[in-house]
A protein has these predicted regions:
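SAM-dependent methyltransferases
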Residues: 1-4, 192-212
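N-terminal Rossmann-like dinucleotide-binding module
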Residues: 1-43, 47
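Donor/substrate-binding cores of folate-linked one-carbon enzymes
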Residues: 23, 88-203
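Short, surface-exposed acidic-centric catalytic microdomains
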Residues: 28-72
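Conserved acidic residues
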Residues: 33, 83, 104
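N-terminal glycine-rich "phosphate-gripper" loop used for MgATP/nucleotide binding
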Residues: 37-38, 61-62, 66, 80-96
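Residue-level detector of anion-binding/catalytic polar loops
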Residues: 54, 83, 132
């Protein structure tokens, strides 16, 4: 069986990338084929290079506009024959053309229980609204902001003292687990879109990896 090849897009330190490398890379037929960033100084690129993974930088300033940059990124990913594009702390919206090109093959992890608190600073939004429970969502990416079909979610209780640091630490821990779990399910062909409702995906929970 063929290897399931994933590309990871990053902007920051790469803790979610590191979790993918530790939990999935080279296991069960899953391979991190390449890592790309919109930030040349991203620590995540160092993590990828340390693991012997090909990297590239696609800055918006190096292209005429976002669409041109995303077209170049898409060509680079297509040349590497990736099966899935994973947004792991990639802090920029993808252009509609890129999303259409990789339709249902892009996943993102978001630190809230969508559709609540989309966009930036989801933890701050949750604290400002006084919620007692927030969480983590892994979803397919569409043309909107954190609006794609939900693959997996997990709740996280907000500390009674409203401490942001403790909440962020727990959310990061859950992000690492949930994103890896979602990738494993997608690689096992256990996630499928609903032909009658584009908002819904169906997930088989008990599966074995079908690649490798």
């Amino acid at each position: 069986m063929s290897t399931f090849r994933i590309a990871v897009l990053v902007s920051g330190t790469g803790t979610n990338l590191q979790a993918i490398l530790d939990r999935l890379h080279g296991q069960g037929g899953i391979e991190v084929a390449c890592v790309a960033s919109n930030k040349p100084g991203a620590r995540a690129l160092e993590r990828a290079r340390d693991a012997g993974i090909e990297t590239a930088v696609f800055e918006r300033a190096a292209h005429s506009d976002r669409q041109a940059r995303d077209a170049a990124l898409g060509d680079w990913l297509a040349e590497r024959e990736v099966d899935l594009v994973v947004l792991a702390g990639y802090m920029e919206l993808l252009s509609p053309g890129f999303v259409q090109r990789f339709r249902d093959r892009i996943v993102n992890v978001h630190p809230a229980l969508l559709p609540s608190f989309p966009g930036l600073d989801a933890v701050g939004q949750a604290l400002a609204h006084g919620v007692r429970v927030t969480g983590v969502t892994v979803h397919l990416v569409d043309e909107g902001v954190d609006s794609g079909p939900i693959v997996l979610q997990r709740a996280v209780e907000v500390p009674l003292d409203r401490g942001r640091a403790a909440l962020e630490q727990e959310i990061h821990r859950v992000e690492h687990e949930l994103l890896s779990e979602a990738i494993r399910l997608i690689a096992a062909e256990a996630v499928r879109t609903d032909p009658e409702n584009a908002r819904i995906v169906h997930v088989e929970s008990q599966v074995e990896t079908r690649h490798g």
